[in-house]
Amino acid sequence: MKNILVTGGLGFIGSNFVNHISSKYDNVNIYVYDIGDYCASVENVEWNNRTKLIKGDIRNFDLIMHTLTEHEIDTIVHFAAHSHVDNSFKNSLAFTETNVFGTHVLLECSRMYGKLKLFFHMSTDEVYGEIDTTDTSREVSLLCPTNPYAATKAGAEHIVKSYFLSYKLPIIIARCNNVYGRNQYPEKLIPKFICSLLDGKKLHIQGTGNSRRNFIHAIDVADAVDLVINNGVIGETYNIGVTNEHSVLDVAQILCDIAGVNLENQLEYVPDRLFNDFRYNITNDKIKSLGWEQSRKDFKKELVELFDWYKVNRHRYNIPGSQ
């Protein structure tokens, strides 16, 4: 790994990965490829002389080919995607165009380029679909996505895997829990609740608020991706998951405690999603076999730190109605 292209590198998970790699390796050139969408920010990246920004769309075949050849890219780490489930119900075609077609463009450019050592594709645990309270999803489990976002991620995975089987393109796929941490645009649950509390607004609870998610810190994800890139087996898929399951109401309670306000006074119940998976639960023994361990285990402590971070840094995001 000498010249690495990180798609979506101005976004949430992408920027955390860029900052991790930049601080850990002093001999890696990082090319941040990003369209600069509403949820991205140049302030998310800790820039230095080894990190360079290329503004572009992953559907732009010519620009991707030029970037690969001009910078002698040996590794692609593909984070770029539309990822907000609520938006996928409203504009599903845009999700297909970027998440499926955009990924296909990257793969075809990689095949034609012919010098790539690794194409890493970040996916989500949502591709497994909803499971009950006793089940877990392994890497070989059936994919059964239930919303347009998850369906596009599953579709992209199938194309990625086909390029490994058909063209021997060196690929690795990872599926991740719900990620939280710095640099996340406040449309997702945790930063949205934090910013609402900071602005004195109600916390909007979809449905009953009883749906559950496992939350993993972005720093743990960056470390896991780094490990998989360097030690993972080509052609394999790895779950990146933890046991840190909380309901939406649990998260609201923790954040209200941090803000020093009464939970019941802050809640406003709104209609649920068209389909809202109750829970996901993935195994992590495969990635643990590579030596990965979760480091950010104290969820409440991390949320206190994150609350303070958004107090100072939410200005970088154009949040409607924010003070």
From Swiss-Prot:
It is an enzyme of class 4 (lyase). Substrate binds at T124. It comes from the Viruses. The lineage of its organism: Viruses, Varidnaviria, Bamfordvirae, Nucleocytoviricota, Megaviricetes. This is Putative dTDP-D-glucose 4,6-dehydratase. The keyword Lyase applies. Disulfide bonds: none annotated. InterPro entries: dTDP_Gluc_deHydtase, NAD(P)-bd_dom, NAD(P)-bd_dom_sf. Its cofactor is NAD(+). SUPFAM superfamilies: NAD(P)-binding Rossmann-fold domains. GO terms for biological process: nucleotide-sugar metabolic process. The active site is at D125 (proton donor), E126 (proton acceptor), Y149 (proton acceptor). It catalyses: dTDP-alpha-D-glucose = dTDP-4-dehydro-6-deoxy-alpha-D-glucose + H2O. Belongs to the NAD(P)-dependent epimerase/dehydratase family. dTDP-glucose dehydratase subfamily. It holds the Pfam family GDP_Man_Dehyd. Keywords: Lyase, NAD. One of its GO terms (molecular function) is dTDP-glucose 4,6-dehydratase activity. Its EC number is 4.2.1.46.
